[in-house]
C-alpha cells in the first residue's frame, strides 16, 4: 500500500487543506499519516474529523524573527523534532510528504529530504512564512496561492484551493431556526475571526450589541462557547462545521481577518467582505499584504484593527452594500481559484 505523510499546524489555516486532501488519498487506497504536535490544533482537528489517519507527535519549537532566550531552547526542540521525524520516515518509507506550513512542519520536511522522500509544500500567503522559507530549500516543489517571484524556480502558481463552492448547499434544520430570529428586511453581517483572531470582533459585538442588532442581523463566530447566544437579530456560536458554508451564504457581508484561506473562500462565492487584518504586532504582516492585494483587485474593503470602531465599520459596510454589483462582478471574473478535485489530480500527477 502506498503511504503519504502530511504535516502542518499551529493554526487552522495550516491544517485546512490537509483535511480536504486526506480523504481523497484514503479513498484512493493510500495509507495516510500525519506528523504534528499532539498539543496543537492539528491533532484536535484530525480527531474531530474522524479520518483514518495515524498521528505521530514530535517536539516542536517556535521559529522567531527576533532575539529571545527561548530561541536557544527551541533550537534543541527543533533538532529533536528532526531526529523523531527521521525515525518516522525511515520506519514508514512513505512515497511522499505534503506540508501546509507552520512551525511544526519544518522538522518533518528536513527529515523527509534527508531520507530521500519527495517533499511537496503549499504556501497560501502573498509572502512566504519563515517555516516555508526554510522548507522551500528542501522541497521538491512548492504550490502557491499567489504568484511568486520568478527566481523561485520550484514554485508552481495554482491559485487558491477552497473548501467552499459557488453552488448552494442544502439548508440544515439549524439554519432555519436561526433565520426565524432574523429580520428579513435587515442586511446580515457575519463576523469570522479564525482560530486566533476572533477576540476583537467578539469585543466589538459585545460592546455594541444593541446598535448592531438594530441595524443588522449579526452572526458572530466567536471561538468561545461562553458567548453562545441566539436571540432577536443575533446568533453567536463558538464553532461550526456543516453550518459554515450555509452561514456564509446567508450573510450579505462578511467581516473577516486576512488569512488567505478565508478570504479566498469568500472570493469563491463572490461574497462582499471587509478585511480586518492582524497587525504586525500579532503576525509577520502577511494578512496586511493579503488585504492590500484584495483591495487592489477590487474584491474587498479593508480596515486596520487600530482603526476599527462601530462608525468606521459601518462606513465600510455601507460602501460595500451600495456598490454590491461592482465588487461581485470583479470577484466573479477572478481566475485565481482551483477546485479541490483539480488540485488533487495535479498533486497525484506530480507524485507519479
Curated annotation (Swiss-Prot):
The reaction(s) this protein catalyses: Mur2Ac(oyl-L-Ala-gamma-D-Glu-L-Lys-D-Ala-D-Ala)-di-trans,octa-cis-undecaprenyl diphosphate + UDP-N-acetyl-alpha-D-glucosamine = beta-D-GlcNAc-(1->4)-Mur2Ac(oyl-L-Ala-gamma-D-Glu-L-Lys-D-Ala-D-Ala)-di-trans,octa-cis-undecaprenyl diphosphate + UDP + H(+)
Topology in the lipid bilayer: Peripheral membrane protein
GO biological process: carbohydrate metabolic process; cell division; cell wall organization; lipid glycosylation; peptidoglycan biosynthetic process; regulation of cell shape
Amino acids binding UDP-N-acetyl-alpha-D-glucosamine: 195, 287
Functional pathway: Cell wall biogenesis; peptidoglycan biosynthesis
UniProtKB keywords: Cell cycle, Cell division, Cell membrane, Cell shape, Cell wall biogenesis/degradation, Glycosyltransferase, Membrane, Peptidoglycan synthesis, Transferase
Enzyme superclass (EC): transferase
Localization per Swiss-Prot or TrEMBL: Cell membrane
Gene Ontology MF: a single term: undecaprenyldiphospho-muramoylpentapeptide beta-N-acetylglucosaminyltransferase activity
Primary site of residence: membrane
EC number, as in UniProt: 2.4.1.227
UniProt keyword Signal, yes or no: no
Domain of life of the organism encoding this protein: Bacteria
PANTHER family noted in UniProt: UDP-N-ACETYLGLUCOSAMINE--N-ACETYLMURAMYL-(PENTAPEPTIDE) PYROPHOSPHORYL-UNDECAPRENOL N-ACETYLGLUCOSAMINE TRANSFERASE, UDP-N-ACETYLGLUCOSAMINE--N-ACETYLMURAMYL-(PENTAPEPTIDE) PYROPHOSPHORYL-UNDECAPRENOL N-ACETYLGLUCOSAMINE TRANSFERASE 1
Similarity annotation: Belongs to the glycosyltransferase 28 family. MurG subfamily.
Protein name (Swiss-Prot/TrEMBL): UDP-N-acetylglucosamine--N-acetylmuramyl-(pentapeptide) pyrophosphoryl-undecaprenol N-acetylglucosamine transferase
Organism, scientific name: Streptococcus pneumoniae (strain Hungary19A-6)
Amino acid at each position: 500500500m502506498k503511504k503519504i505523510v502530511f504535516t502542518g499546524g499551529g493554526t487552522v489555516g495550516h491544517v485546512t487543506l490537509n483535511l480536504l486532501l486526506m480523504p481523497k488519498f484514503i479513498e484512493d487506497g493510500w495509507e495516510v499519516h500525519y506528523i504534528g504536535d499532539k498539543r496543537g490544533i492539528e491533532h484536535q482537528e484530525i480527531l474531530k474529523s474522524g479520518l483514518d489517519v495515524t498521528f505521530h507527535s514530535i517536539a516542536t519549537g517556535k521559529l522567531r524573527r527576533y532575539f529571545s532566550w527561548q530561541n536557544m531552547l527551541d533550537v534543541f526542540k527543533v533538532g529533536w523534532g528532526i531526529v523523531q521525524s527521521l525515525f518516522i520516515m525511515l520506519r514508514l518509507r512513505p512515497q511522499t510528504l505534503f506540508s501546509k506550513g507552520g512551525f511544526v512542519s519544518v522538522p518533518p520536511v528536513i527529515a523527509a529530504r534527508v531520507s530521500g522522500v519527495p517533499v511537496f509544500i503549499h504556501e497560501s500567503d502573498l509572502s512566504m512564512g519563515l517555516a516555508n522559507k526554510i522548507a522551500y530549500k528542501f522541497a521538491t516543489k512548492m504550490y502557491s496561492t499567489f504568484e511568486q517571484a520568478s527566481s523561485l524556480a520550484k514554485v508552481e502558481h495554482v491559485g487558491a484551493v477552497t473548501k467552499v463552492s459557488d453552488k448552494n448547499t442544502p439548508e440544515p434544520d439549524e439554519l432555519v431556526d436561526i433565520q426565524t430570529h432574523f429580520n428579513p428586511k435587515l442586511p446580515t453581517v457575519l463576523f469570522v475571526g479564525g482560530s486566533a483572531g476572533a477576540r476583537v470582533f467578539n469585543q466589538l459585538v459585545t460592546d455594541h450589541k444593541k446598535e448592531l442588532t438594530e441595524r443588522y442581523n449579526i452572526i458572530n463566530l466567536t471561538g468561545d462557547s461562553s458567548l453562545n447566544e441566539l436571540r432577536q437579530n443575533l446568533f453567536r456560536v463558538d464553532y461550526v462545521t456543516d453550518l459554515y458554508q450555509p452561514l456564509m451564504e446567508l450573510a450579505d457581508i462578511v467581516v473577516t481577518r486576512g488569512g488567505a484561506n478565508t478570504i479566498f473562500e469568500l472570493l469563491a462565492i463572490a461574497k462582499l467582505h471587509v478585511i480586518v487584518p492582524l497587525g504586525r504586532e500579532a503576525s509577520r504582516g502577511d494578512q496586511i499584504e493579503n488585504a492590500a492585494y484584495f483591495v487592489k483587485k477590487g474584491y474587498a474593503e479593508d480596515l486596520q484593527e487600530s482603526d476599527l470602531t462601530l462608525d468606521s465599520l459601518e462606513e465600510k459596510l455601507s460602501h460595500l452594500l451600495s456598490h454590491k454589483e461592482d465588487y461581485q462582478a470583479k470577484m466573479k471574473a477572478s481566475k485565481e481559484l482551483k477546485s479541490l478535485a483539480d488540485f488533487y489530480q495535479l498533486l497525484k500527477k506530480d507524485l507519479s
